[in-house]
């Protein structure tokens, strides 16, 4: 049925293997009967390494020309476009290499989409795909066309039947105002979809989690043709009662156990299920797919899970999040908690713009459109660049307010002493931002009786107001964390060059530069701009330093000399970077940055 696209499969597999092993996402689902809000709650951490910049857009509903085709990844299949597409909120993972498997959506009908990579399937189960297969198109087309979660499943599985999935595997969480589903896709055209029950809580890291799937539940379960039969034939599933497929263990039949046992998955599963059930699971096979909890969960409970660190975090001599075994991880670049509502306009989101254990969840009404300042590209330009990004689009821009959140997170990663104090301030800010949400919804619902447009405009104004307040607080926090000025004494840095580059740390009333410890000084990218393989100790070390007055203010400064390629080896050529200097004076950490074009 399918002709193989080796290139697309190889590229996708390599990318996911790296991402899963060090980075990886987390998703929590709370059924409406066990939710403090009385509605479904979905929490999600999005993890991707490198120079990732998360933007938020509203894409308007559109009418398309007859015969229009859409193509996302260069090697993926061309797909006929629908005549009409819905408007949708788009939280974009903007990556230099293109992000096929990261973006989140809430469309005007309330269909909400997040996903988790579930790679490393059994090699013998890989299938051929047609015309390059489909990857990013699954999520984007569901967002554009689906009016319900069930319809989204139908759209996705029709695409799988026609083209096949070119990545190893993934679990999509798809909600609407009435129900929430998970669609686990295996490379090619194998999949299982299950409706999350109203009294369940689900957690998933980066392995398939569905077990004990009742395939006879025609209302709540769907499977691809031949999925169960193949598992039985291969000896990977034996029904408890022959011929009765009420206990199908999808995760065991279609993914090696080593992925569940891998520490980056095992540790997150253990942390999350401990917080959900109060029980410590010590075996990967013990982890449930879902539980019926003995208590209700609210937004704050979900936040606590998504913010959870591991015991390996916060060790001296490392970035705070170095190992990546917690739920809030080195490469968590955004986190969101969605509270569903019968009216899509009133769906609430609580969203971070950097690592959730270091920055605030900012209240947002996604269908009311995000603040314009949360993006630096228009939605159509962002779409064009999603798989064809320009290096200059990844410039550090001090005028883009989202950098205040990223800068604060980067500083905290080095200044461990400030971690707890920062979180107290973050929680205080969240309390202030969130205390008016109930009243805002009450007002919006009254406005909607008169004019839905006026209700939308009013909620949008609240999106802008809350984002602005949060940004101001983060900028103030960063200025306190990083009070000392850093200058890169060059316009550009050659990422392959052996020449010297100098970086100055300016002295001031509180910093006597002769007290700076050369042995504790390194330079390079910020924590949020690199993957899990880059550590604090792998950054550039100075070959020498000199004390002198750089800016002519009569105060001594210190100038460090580095080799250019050592500083820029983990940076993107063609972009202006925030080049970080990490040091200490009298055992007090110093973190700051200057800027330079990377060549």
List each language-model region with its residue ranges.
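Bacterial N-terminal signal peptides that target proteins for export
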Residues: 1-9
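Boundary/junction segments of secreted and surface-exposed precursor proteins
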Residues: 24, 483-508
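A contiguous strand-loop segment
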Residues: 25-135, 155-294
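Long, well-ordered mid-to-C-terminal structural blocks that present hydrophobic/aromatic surfaces
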Residues: 285-381
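Charged low-complexity "KEKE/polyampholyte" interaction tracts
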Residues: 354-358, 364-482
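Acidic, glycine-anchored loop motifs typical of Ca2+
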Residues: 495-496, 529, 543-569
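A short beta-turn/strand-edge loop motif at beta-sheet boundaries
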Residues: 496, 509-517, 570-571
């Amino acid at each position: 049925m399918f002709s193989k696209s080796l290139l697309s499969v190889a590229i996708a597999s390599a990318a996911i293997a790296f991402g899963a092993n060090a980075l990886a996402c987390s998703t929590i689902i709370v059924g409406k009967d066990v939710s403090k809000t009385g509605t479904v709650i979905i929490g999600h951490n999005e993890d991707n390494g490198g120079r990732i910049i998360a933007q938020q857009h509203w894409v308007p509903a559109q009418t398309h020309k007859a015969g229009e085709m859409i193509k996302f990844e260069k090697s993926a299949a061309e797909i006929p476009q629908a005549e009409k597409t819905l408007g949708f909120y788009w939280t974009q993972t903007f990556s230099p290499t293109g992000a096929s498997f990261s973006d989140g959506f809430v469309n005007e009908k309330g269909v909400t989409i997040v996903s988790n990579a579930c790679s490393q399937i059994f090699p013998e189960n890989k299938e051929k795909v047609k015309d390059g297969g489909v990857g990013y198109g699954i999520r984007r087309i569901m967002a554009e066309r689906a009016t319900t979660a069930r319809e989204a499943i139908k759209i996705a599985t029709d695409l799988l039947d026609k083209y096949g999935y070119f990545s190893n595997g993934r679990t999509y969480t798809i909600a609407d105002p009435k129900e929430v589903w998970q669609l686990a896709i295996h490379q090619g055209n194998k999949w299982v979809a299950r409706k999350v029950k109203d009294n369940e809580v689900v957690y998933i890291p980066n392995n398939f989690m569905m077990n004990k799937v009742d395939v006879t539940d025609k209302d709540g379960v769907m499977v691809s043709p031949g999925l169960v039969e193949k598992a039985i034939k291969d000896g990977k599933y034996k029904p408890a009662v022959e011929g009765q497929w009420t206990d199908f263990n999808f995760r065991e039949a279609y993914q090696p156990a080593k992925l569940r046992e891998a520490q980056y998955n095992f540790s997150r599963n253990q942390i999350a299920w401990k917080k959900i059930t109060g029980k410590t699971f010590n075996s990967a096979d013990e982890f449930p797919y879902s539980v019926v909890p003995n208590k209700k969960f609210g937004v704050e409970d979900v936040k606590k899970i998504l913010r959870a660190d591991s015991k390996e975090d916060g060790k001296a001599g490392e970035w705070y999040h170095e190992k990546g075994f917690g739920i809030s991880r080195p490469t968590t670049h955004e986190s969101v908690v969605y509270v569903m509502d019968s009216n899509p306009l009133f769906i609430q989101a609580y969203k971070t713009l950097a690592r959730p254990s270091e920055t605030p969840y900012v209240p947002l009404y996604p269908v009311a459109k995000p603040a314009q300042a949360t993006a630096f590209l228009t939605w159509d330009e962002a779409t064009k660049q999603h798989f064809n990004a320009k290096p200059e689009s990844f410039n550090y821009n001090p005028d883009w307010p989202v950098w205040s959140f990223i800068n604060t997170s980067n500083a905290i990663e080095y200044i461990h002493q400030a971690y707890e104090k920062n979180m107290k301030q973050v929680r205080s800010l969240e309390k202030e931002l969130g205390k008016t949400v109930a009243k805002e919804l009450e007002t919006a619902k009254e406005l909607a009786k008169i004019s839905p447009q006026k209700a939308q405009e009013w909620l949008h104004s609240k999106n802008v107001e809350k984002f602005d307040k949060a940004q101001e607080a983060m900028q103030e926090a960063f200025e306190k964390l990083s009070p000392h000025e850093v200058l890169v004494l060059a316009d550009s840095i050659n990422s392959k060059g052996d020449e010297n580059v100098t970086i100055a740390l300016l002295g001031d009333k509180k910093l006597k530069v002769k007290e700076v410890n050369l042995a504790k000084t390194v330079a390079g990218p910020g924590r949020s701009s690199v993957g899990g393989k880059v550590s604090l100790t792998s950054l550039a070390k100075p070959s020498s330093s000199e004390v002198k007055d750089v800016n002519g203010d009569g105060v001594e400064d210190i100038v460090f000399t580095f080799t250019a390629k050592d500083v820029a080896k983990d940076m993107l050529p063609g972009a202006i970077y925030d080049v970080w200097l990490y040091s200490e004076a009298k055992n007090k950490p110093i973190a700051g940055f200057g800027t330079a074009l990377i060549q």
